[in-house]
Structures are given as structure tokens and as C-alpha cells.
Amino acid sequence: MPEGKTDMERIGLFSEMGYTSIGDKYAAPGSKPFNESASKNRQMLPGGSKSMANMLGGYFDGQFKRVFEGESYSDPFKQRRQHRMQQSKKNLGKPFLPSSGEKKRSGLGSFYGTLGGPVVAFSAELKSRKAYTAPGKNFYTNPPKDGSGYGYPSVTIGKPYPYSSENYDISRELIKKEIEHHKSKLKGGAFKLNLHPKDYFEPNPYYTDKTLPPLKVHSQKKETEKPFKPSSPAKEAGGMKAGTFDPYPTHSNDPYTAKPSKTPVKERKVFHPPGGPKTYPVHSILTSNVIKSVTALNYKTVNLASY
């Protein structure tokens, strides 16, 4: 028998069960089939049962009416008629009629109540008149004018201007003649130099025609390779130590607390915490009692005690 706990003891399945139970027998984990719904009944499950919509598309009423349990049906048309009948009972007699008849209106255009009545001179009726005949024209004592002068020849004081023709492109022809006269005086074509054109000033501002002096020969110094030495000695870790008598404060021999003596590891034993109870998935007592008592055959007639 090896030392220590076995795997079954570490898992905790063989530990002592709780005393609160309903008397069920132990069922091994492998005794029940895994994913039983994948191999039985219908495999393809389409959409579930249809539920009633919340809209008024399939109802006869235009709006929801309240319906309570035990409430009688109420017809709005019947209630409206009953209300009118109750209001008509409040009438004491016939409708009120004034003692005198309807009075004639007395206002603009009405002569009711006046002493003289309507005036004939202010009547709106049209009077009969003779047909209108237009008067004749006056006698002409002077012949008509030939015009105001605009567009009429030989009417104004001065004589009209004689017509003179003018060429439309006279300016173009004059320029052409000047160009031909200029070309006739030229002796030859334009002078063309077969060299690359240069600027008047040199583009290089440092260019000079003078000869440069000879280069100075610098004597090379002999360099002696010496190891590099810093100007100050190396600093120790922990900050600046310059200006102190000691490089680091010495440890005080008077201890603040007594240090415990450490024993070697070989003499001490390794601490092992005690093993507590292992957790595993279990059903509650109430759930287990319901699963055991209620089945597919007696779920309609079973009567469980409730506390």
C-alpha cells in the first residue's frame, strides 16, 4: 500500500455523505447516458408554437378594450342613448319661444322705422338715357408735318451726310503693309549663335580666375595610446559618499530586537495542511425530493406536502 491518500480519497466521492437525505441509492456517474436527447425523439426542431401578436391587425376593434374578470359587457352606443334620454327628462316643457315675432333688421340700406321712407333720388336703379354720339373732328388749317427729323431725309435745316463706304478690315490690311515694308528693308536673317547661352553673371559666387595658393601640409603628431582614466575614483553603490569620515555607517552592535536563530532546513519538517472536505456537484434536498416524487405519470395527481 503506497503512502499518502489514494486518488479516490482526494476526489472525495467515497467520503462520508451528509445525513440529510431522502433515501436515494447511489448512482454511478457512468450509469446514465450522456446527451440522451441527441439520439431520441425528433432531431430537427423548427420554430416553436406561435404566439399571439400584440398588434390590432387581426382584430375587429380599432383599439383595445378593458376586460376584467366578472365585468359585464358594455355597449357604448346603448350608453349614449341612455344618457340622451336621461338628459331629455330634465326638460320641463316645450322649447322657449319669444312673445313677439321676428324683428326686421334696421341698418345700412334699410328704411324700417323712418318717417319719410325711402328717398327716390338715392335709389340704386339705373335711369334710361339716349345713346352717346361722339362729336366730329376739328377743321385742319395747316398741312401735316413730314416727320420729326429722325429717319426722314431733307427735313432738318442741314443737308444729310453723303454715304461713304469703308473697308471692314482696313486696320488689318494696314498692319500687313507695315510688316511687308519692314521685311523688305532687312538685309538677312536673324543672327544665331551656335553656342549654349550663358548668363551675364557667373552663377557660382565663389568662382575666380586667379590661381589658388598651394595647400598647406600639416605635420602629423604622434599619438600615444594611453588607457583612459576617469578624473575621480569610481563610486560605490548606494549614493554619494564624498565628505564623510566613513564610506558607510557601521552597523550598531546594540540590536533593536533579538534575532531568532535559524535552524537548518534539513532538521525542520515540511508543513502539510490538513485535507478538508472535497466539493462535488449535488442536488439540494428539495430538488431531489421533487425529482423523486413527481414523474411523467403522476404529475397531474400528485399532492406533495408544503411547509
From Swiss-Prot:
Primary localization: cytoplasm
A Pfam entry, by short name: CFAP96-like
Localization terms from the record: Cytoplasm, Cytoskeleton, Microtubule organizing center, Centrosome
Keyword Signal recorded: no
Stored InterPro entries: CFAP96 (IPR029358)
Any one Gene Ontology cellular component term annotated for this protein: centrosome
Keywords: Cytoplasm, Cytoskeleton
Chain spans, region Disordered: 73-102, 218-279
UniProt entry tagged with the keyword Cytoplasm: yes
Family, per entry: Belongs to the CFAP96 family.
Record's protein name: Cilia-and flagella-associated protein 96
Organism field: Xenopus laevis (African clawed frog)
